[in-house]
Design a protein with these regions (language model features):
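Structural signature of hydrophobic alpha-helical transmembrane segments
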Residues: 2-13, 60-72, 118-122, 153-156, ...
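Juxtamembrane and boundary regions of transmembrane helices in multi-pass small-molecule transporters
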Residues: 138, 157, 177-221, 225-228, ...
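Hydrophobic mid-bilayer segments of alpha-helices in multi-pass membrane transport proteins
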Residues: 7-19, 27-48, 60-72, 124, ...
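Hydrophobic alpha-helical transmembrane segments
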Residues: 12-13, 33-37, 64-65, 99-107, ...
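Membrane-embedded alpha-helical segments and adjacent helix-loop junctions characteristic
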Residues: 3, 51-142, 280-352
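Alpha-helical transmembrane segments and, especially, the helix-loop junctions at the ends
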Residues: 113-123, 140-173, 194-199, 328-344, ...
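Interfacial loop-to-helix junctions that mark the boundaries of transmembrane helices
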Residues: 1-7, 26-29, 52-63, 176-186, ...
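Intrinsically disordered, low-complexity non-transmembrane regions of multi-pass membrane transporters
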Residues: 1-14, 88, 92-95, 199-230, ...
Length: 364
């Protein structure tokens, strides 16, 4: 056990070091080990009671369910060739024009991000796009950049477009109508501006032609079933969002139903899919919930609350710009999950609403 006076120093120090190690990943050790190790150390040293750690983990149940559902669906779609089919269709639809291919890849990336979350675009769609453009024998760089940037630009079109959206708003998630009212125009501008900048940046590469023909990747019956299932799932989630219902459980249940349907139809075991899910990500998020609760209990979020109050004092418009800019920079330095948890905790503790709170989410 550590004396209370020293604990006020040791606790935030352990949290900061754990997050820095998570970002640096020395010796290529996965992020989850650094965060889990930090949480375990906090508990062993008596800085965080086991009961409070359990309560902090329980707070993230909706996020865990959402992540599980989205990861399962993304892996199912990848296994059934949905992403390969989409990438191949984009290349063939370009009809020999790199410029048209750029637009099609951007459109596919936008759609995947909006409906399946930015993780699906970054982790699953990107390799499929890379394979397709290599077969077309064109420079892959513009299209890889597109996947990376649209995963951010379109990540706040809908609540389901980014797990960080659930982390930031947590129990205060706005209903769908208000979400679209608040974020519809900013997200559209984000998507359009990103396209313009990327298009100008790669204008020389996009003036070239695609000389190589690419075979069309046929979508299997199971792949079509997955597509239909995804459409139904999105409809369910939008309905749940409109009714201001938690999104985690509907996402997870929809993913399980779709997976079961495909597994029964194809007479295959879903165990392989379960193995492909990044369970470490769930542990990482759970550990971050514990750490943010721990520093909040020590009053460490008072600094961010004071800064938020200062920004609010500048007025809604100026304050929102300052907050969005600062959070955006911090997001690139740190990571959207720990930053989203800290930002969400600060918003809830300070009871911040309106334009300032929206700017925080856009920054994340």
């Amino acid at each position: 056990m550590i004396p209370a006076g020293i604990g006020h120093v040791v606790l935030p120090l352990i949290v900061v070091i754990s997050i820095l190690l998570m970002l640096a990943r020395p010796h290529a050790i996965p992020e989850v080990w650094w965060i889990s190790g930090g949480v375990l150390l906090l508990i062993v040293l008596g800085l965080v009671p086991l009961r409070l750690a359990g309560q902090a983990v329980a707070k993230g149940s909706d996020v865990y369910l959402f992540l599980m559902g989205m990861m399962l669906l993304s892996e199912l779609a990848r296994e059934q060739g949905v992403f390969d089919w989409a990438a191949s269709a984009a290349v063939r639809g370009a009809h020999g024009s790199c410029s048209r291919l750029f637009l099609l890849v951007y459109s596919v990336g936008t759609l995947v991000t909006i409906l399946l979350s930015n993780d699906a675009t970054a982790v699953v769609l990107t390799p499929a796009i890379l394979t397709a453009v290599r077969k077309a024998k064109v420079s892959p760089l513009p299209y890889l950049f597109v996947c990376a940037f649209i995963a951010n630009a379109a990540s706040f079109v809908l609540p389901i477009s980014n797990p960080a959206n659930l982390v930031v708003f947590h129990t205060g998630m706005p209903p769908l109508g208000r979400w679209l009212s608040d974020f519809g125009v900013p997200s559209l501008l984000s998507i359009l501006m990103t396209f313009v900048v990327m298009r100008l940046l790669f204008r020389s590469e996009l003036c070239k032609s695609i000389e190589c023909e690419v075979e069309d990747a046929m979508l299997s019956r199971n792949g079509k079933l997955v597509l239909v299932g995804l459409g139904l799932m999105v409809a369910v989630l939008l309905t749940a969002s409109a009714m201001k219902t938690d999104l985690g459980l509907p996402t997870c249940l929809a993913a399980l139903v779709i997976t079961a349907s495909v597994s029964i139809k194809s007479k295959s075991s879903p165990i392989k899919l379960a193995r492909e899910i990044s369970w470490g990500t769930l542990l990482l998020v759970a550990g971050l919930f514990v750490m943010v609760d721990a520093v909040e209990s020590q009053g460490a979020l008072n600094v961010t609350q004071r800064w938020l109050a200062w920004a609010t004092g500048l007025g809604q418009s100026v304050g929102a710009m300052a907050v969005g800019f600062a959070v955006g920079i911090a997001n690139n330095v740190v990571n959207n999950l720990p930053l989203g948890l800290i930002a969400g905790g600060t918003i809830q503790a300070a009871h911040t609403k309106g334009l300032i709170a929206n700017a925080v989410l856009i920054g994340v």
